[in-house]
A protein has these predicted regions:
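Amphipathic alpha-helical assembly segments
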Residues: 3-244
């Protein structure tokens, strides 16, 4: 436990810029949160730093929110450490697209994990779709090769507004089912993957895992339920923050 406390103090000073005494005061709560979420002290320090930049809540309240998020992720059937570490390694993406204290990207992280993806791959798809001219050109190429219309306008809109979970669902809707994907030629699969900023391997995994685990609608419903619960928890956290 002493090592965990020392690691917590180091991360707090490096990531939050606190004095030695302030870091010591926060270190026990910090170490407990790291253990509860499966994050290293360094990862948690990054997560807390980016959340602090978007919230007026105290650090203690934010640490409690992080633990609550971890509990919700686990309730959704995903390992909290997997999603938390993913977010900690994509702090710039988190800062750019986070809404509601980052709940939208936590929801996206859960959806991505269920599809066998990481936040790196969600980021890649987001950036590809938002490179509008290139994205539209690739969409047209994929449509030509597939012999059917691919329309990623909705996916682009969702990406732009920070709904990455919805974006992935829309991408899968455009791709089609597992049987349809299996019948495509290499060039068709490659063009389709390119149009959404993915690889054939990752797109295949998405289609396979979506088909194996649930329908797209079921995934969306579970994501929406998690989001509503997280929203309620965020509102409670904000209420607490008013009195701290």
């Amino acid at each position: 436990e002493t090592q965990e406390i020392k690691a917590a103090q180091t991360s707090i000073r490096e990531n939050l810029g606190l004095s030695f005494q302030a870091a010591a005061d926060l270190s026990l709560e910090f170490a407990r949160t790291a253990a509860a979420t499966g994050q290293s002290a360094e990862e948690l320090g990054k997560s807390l730093s980016i959340m602090e930049s978007m919230s007026g809540a105290s650090r203690e309240v934010l640490l409690n929110q992080i633990r609550s998020n971890a509990a919700m992720i686990e309730a959704a059937g995903v390992a909290p450490a997997q999603v938390m570490k993913d977010i900690a390694s994509n702090t710039e993406f988190f800062a750019e697209f986070a809404r509601d204290g980052g709940q939208n990207l936590i929801q996206a992280g859960v959806a991505a994990a269920k599809l066998g993806l990481s936040m790196d791959q969600v980021k890649s798809t987001t950036e590809s779709l938002l490179s509008f001219e290139e994205s539209i050109e690739k969409q047209m190429e994929a449509s030509l090769l597939l012999g059917r219309q691919i329309n990623l306008d909705r996916a682009r809109q969702l990406a732009l507004t920070g709904d990455q979970a919805g974006m992935m669902e829309e991408v899968l809707r455009q791709v089609g089912g597992e049987a349809e994907f299996a019948q495509m030629t290499y060039l068709q699969r490659k063009a389709l993957a390119d149009s959404v900023g993915s690889t054939v391997e990752n797109l295949s995994r998405m289609v396979r895992n979506r088909s194996a685990s649930a329908t797209a609608g079921t995934l969306a419903e579970s994501g929406d339920a998690a989001h509503e619960t997280q929203k309620s928890m965020l509102e409670a956290t904000n209420d607490i923050a008013k009195y701290t």
